[in-house]
Amino acid sequence: VIGTPDGNLYLNSTGNPGMATAGSGDVLTGIIAGLAAQNIPLIESTIAGAYIHGYSGDIFSKNETQTNLIAGDLIRNLPETLKQVLP
C-alpha cells in the first residue's frame, strides 16, 4: 500500500514473500530514484517503482523459486521486466 499526504491510497498487486530479503528495499529505492531522476513526479515514480520492483520478483519466482531470491536477482530481471511493463 502506498499512501500520499492528501490521503490517497494505492495498492500494488505485484511481488511475493520471497522478496523479503536483504537489499530488496535498496533495489526498490534505486528504481524509484531512477524514475524520479527522469523528472517523473515522485508519487508516480513511487507507484511505478513499486510495481516494477514487484514484477521483477514475480518473474524470478516463475523461473526459479521464491525462497532462492536475492536482491541481485531483482536487478538482473529489470531489463525483462521493463520490456514487459513499458509500452
What is the predicted function of each stretch?
Residues 1-87:
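Small-residue (G/A/S/T)-rich helix-start motifs and N-terminal tracts that mark the onset
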